[in-house]
């Protein structure tokens, strides 16, 4: 069973999202380590959302409740947010709703800037991170890979992502009234992560030619070389700030990298009283809000930028949602087929075992021939093909349980299913009950 806990700009404040983003790197591993019944976990954290996707081994209401509470506990511990506040900041989606939600997210339909293209890469990197951490599962792999395919379908079949929508481009739109000549604007880019390339591209599209890059983690030179821009070392940060008209931050640093004292130092170095616009695209925030106490400094942060998100292109959005709904329906159908896979395997194994037994008896009598064996194997393959196909068709129609029952009843087979008594969920429930009695 798939479960998603989601907090976004729709239901949580940016203050909460900022704290959740700090917790994100440790959540999936902790969930897997502490809970046997969670088969996989992928955490997606962006500038406007935090989501934990879980693959729970048993489709039980108890499993859902335990998984949700376990996730709330881990997130609370990692973020420092009170447990009740975490629970109040997340929506829970279960089963079929998870696929449709992630497909919409990866297609940019749930973003602050609807149709923005960066989210698809963030979804892909979330899965890659889970692979690296060893927390993914077969179900989550298929879910996230299908989400990426769906996003590509939305991009190629609708005009939703054709306008280059993104948070950085929206921020530059808002900065337009403050910039007299983009080609003469000197920009300092702070951060070299996945969003830095998109930020640089957006600046260049505006006509900006003077961009320097600074990395709090010391990776400026590695980013600067391939992108053809100068790198700024830590000792030169104040001089770079002093020479800049605009600062764009998109670092993944867990704490603020710029504050009022940096801007005061820059003003002292430049001595020209110039105005500086700081655009903070980081979550957690890269820039301490106290920079606005420095004369001439204006700050655009994610919360402010989000307030100016454009209205949706209704036609393109409707087309995209239709693609998402179709993809989600197909994902549900394919997942339903998996439910009857043990029964189909058991049926095929039984029939081919019977065939092998008969062939062995024929060989012992000396009546066997290669042609006879080949013909019998072909006949059995033909006979089991239609029931196998029909089983998958019935599963897609929601009749998977009947297929399993029929195979067991007609052939006397014991289709292997998880043992509820010794299951991780049962054990967890037992522990919970014991803890309640002890208290």
Swiss-Prot record:
Q: What class of enzyme is it?
A: oxidoreductase
Q: In which pathway does it act?
A: Porphyrin-containing compound metabolism; protoporphyrin-IX biosynthesis; 5-aminolevulinate from L-glutamyl-tRNA(Glu): step 1/2
Q: Name one GO molecular function term.
A: glutamyl-tRNA reductase activity
Where do the annotations place NADP(+) binding?
Answer: 191-196
Active-site feature positions:
47
Task: Name any Gene Ontology BP term.
Answer: protoporphyrinogen IX biosynthetic process from glutamate
- The site (Important for activity) lies at 101
Specify whether NADP is a keyword of the entry: yes
Q: What are the EC numbers?
A: 1.2.1.70
Q: Origin, by domain of life?
A: Bacteria
Q: Where does substrate bind?
A: 46-49, 111, 116-118, 122
Q: Which reaction does it catalyse?
A: (S)-4-amino-5-oxopentanoate + tRNA(Glu) + NADP(+) = L-glutamyl-tRNA(Glu) + NADPH + H(+)
Could you list this entry's UniProt keywords, alphabetically sorted.
NADP, Oxidoreductase, Porphyrin biosynthesis
Q: Per the record, what about its domains? A: Possesses an unusual extended V-shaped dimeric structure with each monomer consisting of three distinct domains arranged along a curved 'spinal' alpha-helix. The N-terminal catalytic domain specifically recognizes the glutamate moiety of the substrate. The second domain is the NADPH-binding domain, and the third C-terminal domain is responsible for dimerization.
Q: Family membership, please give it.
A: Belongs to the glutamyl-tRNA reductase family.
Q: How does it assemble?
A: Homodimer.
State the remark under miscellaneous.
During catalysis, the active site Cys acts as a nucleophile attacking the alpha-carbonyl group of tRNA-bound glutamate with the formation of a thioester intermediate between enzyme and glutamate, and the concomitant release of tRNA(Glu). The thioester intermediate is finally reduced by direct hydride transfer from NADPH, to form the product GSA.
What this protein is reported to do is described as: Catalyzes the NADPH-dependent reduction of glutamyl-tRNA(Glu) to glutamate 1-semialdehyde (GSA).
Protein name in UniProt: Glutamyl-tRNA reductase
Q: Which organism is it from?
A: Clavibacter michiganensis subsp. michiganensis (strain NCPPB 382)
* Source species taxonomy: Bacteria, Bacillati, Actinomycetota, Actinomycetes, Micrococcales
């Amino acid at each position: 069973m798939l479960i998603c806990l989601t907090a976004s700009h729709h239901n949580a404040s940016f203050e909460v999202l900022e704290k959740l983003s700090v917790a994100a790197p440790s959540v999936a591993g902790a969930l897997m380590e502490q809970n046997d019944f969670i088969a996989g976990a992928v955490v997606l954290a962006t500038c406007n959302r935090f989501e934990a996707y879980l693959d729970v081994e048993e489709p039980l209401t108890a499993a859902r409740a335990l998984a949700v509470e376990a996730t709330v506990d881990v997130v609370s511990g990692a973020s420092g947010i009170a447990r009740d506040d975490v629970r109040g900041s997340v929506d829970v989606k279960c089963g079929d709703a998870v696929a449709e939600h992630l497909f919409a997210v990866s297609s940019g339909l749930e973003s602050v800037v609807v149709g923005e293209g960066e989210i698809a890469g963030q979804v892909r990197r979330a899965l890659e991170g889970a692979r690296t951490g060893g927390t993914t599962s077969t179900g989550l792999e298929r879910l996230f890979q299908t989400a990426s395919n769906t996003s590509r379908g939305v991009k190629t079949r609708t005009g939703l992502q054709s306008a280059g929508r993104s948070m950085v481009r929206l921020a530059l739109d808002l900065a337009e009234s403050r910039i007299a000549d983009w080609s003469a604007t000197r920009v300092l880019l702070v951060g070299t992560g996945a969003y830095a390339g998109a930020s640089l591209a957006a600046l260049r599209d505006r006509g900006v030619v003077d961009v320097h890059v600074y990395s709090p983690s010391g990776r400026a030179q590695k980013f600067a070389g391939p992108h053809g821009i100068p790198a700024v070392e830590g000792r030169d940060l104040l001089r770079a700030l002093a020479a800049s008209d605009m600062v764009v931050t998109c670092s993944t640093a867990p704490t603020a990298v710029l504050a009022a004292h940096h801007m005061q130092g820059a003003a002292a170095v430049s001595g020209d009283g110039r105005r500086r616009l700081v655009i903070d695209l980081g979550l957690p925030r890269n820039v301490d809000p106290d920079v606005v106490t420095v004369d001439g400094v204006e700050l655009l942060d994610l919360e402010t930028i989000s307030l100016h998100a454009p209205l949706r292109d209704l036609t393109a959005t409707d087309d995209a949602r239709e693609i998402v709904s179709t993809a989600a329906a197909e994902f549900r159908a394919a997942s339903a087929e998996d439910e009857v896979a043990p029964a189909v395997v058991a049926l095929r194994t039984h029939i081919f075992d019977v065939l092998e037994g008969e062939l062995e008896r024929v060989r012992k009598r000396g009546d066997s021939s290669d042609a006879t064996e080949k013909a019998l194997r072909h006949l059995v393959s033909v006979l089991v093909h239609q029931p196998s196909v029909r089983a998958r068709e019935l599963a897609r129609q929601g009749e998977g349980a009947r297929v399993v029952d029929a195979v067991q009843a007609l052939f006397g087979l014991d289709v292997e299913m998880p043992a509820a008594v010794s299951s991780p969920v049962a054990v967890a429930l037992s522990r919970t009950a014991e803890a309640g009695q002890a208290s």
